[in-house]
Amino acid sequence: MSNIVIVGAQWGDEGKGKIADTLAEKADLVVRYQGGNNAGHTLVVNGKKTFLHLIPSGVLRQHTKCVIGHGVVLDPVALDEEITRLQAKGIAISAENLFVSESCTIITSYHKLLDAVRESNTSEKIGTTGKGIGPAYEDKVSRKGIKFKHLFDKDLLRSRLAISLAEKETLFRDLYKVEYPTLEQEFDKLFALGQKLKQYAADTFSIIDQAIAAGKNVVYEGAQGVLLDVDYGTYPFVTSSNTSVAGVYSGATTAGHGLDHVIGITKAYTTRVGEGPFPTELFDDVGKFIQHKGGEIGVTTGRIRRCGWLDLPLLKYSAKCSNLTSIALTKVDVLSDMDTLKVCIGYKYEGKEIYCAYPGIDLYKVEPILVEMEPFSIDETVTKDNMPAALKTYLKTIENHVGIPISSLAYGPSREQILFFEDYFKKG
């Protein structure tokens, strides 16, 4: 039995879905524990791409059960559409392999509208996906939220909707002056969706608890990345949930269950979508080359990702925030055959050199300390035995500065293009 957590160690888009899909081969459960359909995971199997936003990456494995934990904010429209799209591709999804927590907070049309009008009416853009994630978490924390189980009870749903709409109605009408669905329109839509999705509702807390007690393998699949964590991230340019390992305990299981591995998924370079500081960002042809070769376009938003060199002070910070046990390095192939290769090992900041970021640091004011690395060349024939010396040096540089080992290396989009240096399912 192993409890394994997959955490994004950067600003998201690190390739968590690929690693989760690979580990799902031996997993009994794959669990999403935070975020919502602002996540976008791409799986490539036999040359065919599958895009996931809510459903865990274990869905392509016939024996693996997929769980959406109570920490996820759930857009029932998006879930219904995703299930329909996957089923149309011949992917089996039923109440036998998909379990959605009855306690998930629901995203309504009001949340999505509020998200959109706020972003369009402010001069300080956050770069939100516009999916209603933040407003839904606001309602959850202020006790105005609607739970998944509320969709199945007409009276309860109507009363919860009235509570949720009360303040928003004034904002829509008087401040933003936009049209919005009436309570009855939203009620009719949500109740109908509830009847359709009710088959997937489950006590996921007990499902996970019983699986662990029975010695099953459980993989917890995070969304976004530690640097977008609402507490640890580059605030205010963050998401609205705990994307660090802390989200596992608040969004899926209990602290009484130990974690065997916390794997930080990390690109061999750095990317970011939307606004916010980015110390190693490249604005030249090298950045454009990485962007093009890496296919750096957001699955959820379709926005071009900003690209830069690997930032080890931020990676070390992420490792500390989530108590990472190892790193899964992805998209190494993107850096193959480059004329120039650099890595950031530290910052010059306020007259000092620092080698690990921290919550109070102003990343807009740091000067990255970049070191030249010897370029390397790899292709699909790379193995642990024939790995070029320059790549080994690149990996060792990361390990030495961050202080934890690299446990796997992904060198292409398909599930077969990955080297494992550690068996995550082998204890001790």
UniProtKB/Swiss-Prot annotation:
Which reaction is catalysed here? IMP + L-aspartate + GTP = N(6)-(1,2-dicarboxyethyl)-AMP + GDP + phosphate + 2 H(+)
**Sites where the protein binds Mg(2+):** 13, 40
Keyword list, A-Z:
Cytoplasm, GTP-binding, Ligase, Magnesium, Metal-binding, Nucleotide-binding, Purine biosynthesis
> What GO MF annotations does this protein's record show?
adenylosuccinate synthase activity; GTP binding; magnesium ion binding
Listed GO biological process terms: 'de novo' AMP biosynthetic process; IMP metabolic process
Q: Note how many cofactor molecules are bound and how.
A: Binds 1 Mg(2+) ion per subunit.
CC annotations in GO: cytoplasm
Compartment(s): Cytoplasm
Recorded hits in InterPro entries, A to Z, give:
Adenylosuccin_syn_GTP-bd, Adenylosuccin_syn_Lys_AS, Adenylosuccinate_synth_dom1, Adenylosuccinate_synth_dom2, Adenylosuccinate_synth_dom3, Adenylosuccinate_synthetase, P-loop_NTPase
Entry EC no(s) = 6.3.4.4
Listed binding positions for GTP are 12-18, 40-42, 305, 331-333, 410-412
**Pathway where this protein functions:** Purine metabolism; AMP biosynthesis via de novo pathway; AMP from IMP: step 1/2
Which CDD domains does its entry note? AdSS
What this protein needs as a cofactor is: Mg(2+)
Q: Classify the source by domain of life.
A: Bacteria
Residues annotated to bind IMP: 13-16, 38-41, 129, 143, 224, 239, 303
| Function statement | Plays an important role in the de novo pathway of purine nucleotide biosynthesis. Catalyzes the first committed step in the biosynthesis of AMP from IMP.
Return the protein name: Adenylosuccinate synthetase
Write down the species: Francisella tularensis subsp. tularensis (strain SCHU S4 / Schu 4)
The gene that this protein is the product of is: purA
